[in-house]
Amino acid sequence: MYDNPLEISFLSLFTLITFFIFLIIQKFSKRIFDGKLLDNNFDKPQAFHHEEISRCGGLASIISLIIFIYLHNFFFSKIFYEYLIIAFGLFLVGFLDDLKINIKPIFRLISMMLILSASVAFFSIDIERVDLIFLNIWMKNEYFLILFVLFCFLFVINGSNLIDGFNGLLAINLLAINLILAVINMQNDLFEYLFLLIAQIIILITFLLFNFPKAKMFFGDSGSYLFGSLTALNVIYTNNFNEKISSFFFCVLL
C-alpha cells in the first residue's frame, strides 16, 4: 500500500504546481518566442481547430518534470539523472522543430541517436532479459545491446510522434501505458520508482485537461519526443524490475 504521508503531500503540491505551469504557459503562449509556438496551419488533415493553438505542451511538461526532479532531490536526496538528461535532450530536438526551425529529418534522427546512444552507454541502461533465448545471448555483446536499446527508444519515440495529431489521442495512449506500469510496480512494492511514474501521470493528466476534448494546447514534437523517451525508459525499467512478467507483455503494451 502506497501510504507515505510526505510523498503523498509532495505529489499533491506537485499537482498544483504542474497545473499552474500549464495554465500560465497556455495563457501567455502568444508572447513566448514571439508566437512561434502557435499552430496556425488549419489545412493539415488532422487539423480540427480554426484558431491559433499553442504547441507549448512539451515546454510545460519539461518545466514540470525538471521542477519535480529538483524538488525530489531536495526533499528525498534522490535525483533521476538518466530521466533528466534523456528527457531534456529529446525535448530540445523536438523543440527546434516546434519553433519552425527547418531541420532535415535525417539530422533530427541523427541527433536523437547520438543523445540516446551516449545516455544508454553512460548510464548503463540495458534490457536485462527478453523471452527470446537468442536475443539474450546476443545482448551479452555490449555493442549489440546498445543498438537494441537504441532501437527500442526510437520505436516508441517515433510511434508517439506518429499518433500525435488528434486531440487527446497520444496523451490517453501514454496515460494508459504508464498507469499499467504504475500498477505493476505498486503490486511489487517498487514505491520509489512508482513515485516517478505518478509524477509523469500527473503531467499527462494535466496536459489532457488542456488538450481534450477541445484543444487549448498541443504537445508539439517536443512533447511527443519527450514523453516517448520517458515511456520507453519506464517500460525498460519495469521489465527489468519485474522478472515474473513476460517481456512479451511489455511489447504488446506498447
Where are these regions (language model features)?
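Cytosolic, membrane-interface loops and tails of multi-pass inner-membrane proteins
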Residues: K27-S54
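Short clusters of hydrophobic/aromatic residues that line enzyme substrate/ligand-binding pockets
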Residues: F48, V130, M217
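Hydrophobic/aromatic positions within or immediately flanking transmembrane alpha-helices
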Residues: S54, L145-F148, L197, F218
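Alpha-helical transmembrane segments
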Residues: Y2-R31, L38, S61-G89, L170-L254
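Short, Lys/Arg-rich N-terminal segment immediately upstream of the first membrane anchor
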Residues: M1-I8, H50-E51, N136-M139
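A short N-terminal beta->alpha junction/helix N-cap motif
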Residues: L16, F20, H50-E51, R55
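Short capping/connector residues at structural and topological boundaries
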Residues: I53, G58, L135, S222-S224
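Intramembrane alpha-helical segments
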Residues: L59-N188, I202-F212
